[in-house]
Swiss-Prot record:
Pfam families: Ribosomal_S19 (PF00203). It comes from Clostridioides difficile (strain 630). One of its GO terms (cellular component) is cytoplasm. The lineage of its organism: Bacteria, Bacillati, Bacillota, Clostridia, Peptostreptococcales. Keywords: Ribonucleoprotein, Ribosomal protein, RNA-binding, rRNA-binding. This is Small ribosomal subunit protein uS19. GO terms for biological process: ribosomal small subunit assembly; translation. InterPro entries: Ribosomal_uS19 (IPR002222), Ribosomal_uS19_bac-type (IPR005732), Ribosomal_uS19_CS (IPR020934), Ribosomal_uS19_SF (IPR023575). Gene3D superfamilies: 30s Ribosomal Protein S19, Chain A (3.30.860.10). Belongs to the universal ribosomal protein uS19 family. Protein S19 forms a complex with S13 that binds strongly to the 16S ribosomal RNA.
Amino acid sequence: MSRSTKKGPFVHARLLKKIEAMNASGNKEVIKTWSRSSTVFPQMVENTIAVHDGRKHVPVYITEDMVGHKLGEFVPTRTFKGHKDDEKSNKRK
């Protein structure tokens, strides 16, 4: 179920404040955030945001194609290490 249109898209207030301050100063630095549920706004384009994946912050460079999506969509939280090998298939006859 999607968010109500009367509420508008969600973005963490402090994150948006940092982005606007960076755009005004022209400074390009990585911003750390834990807010994976924040929506990517047009003001964030061409900035790098380090999104937390539960263990570390992963840097994500924001492009125009990402506008409207959530920050958490671009950082996977689980690492797939492969299926466990069956011991029967490892034995030679």
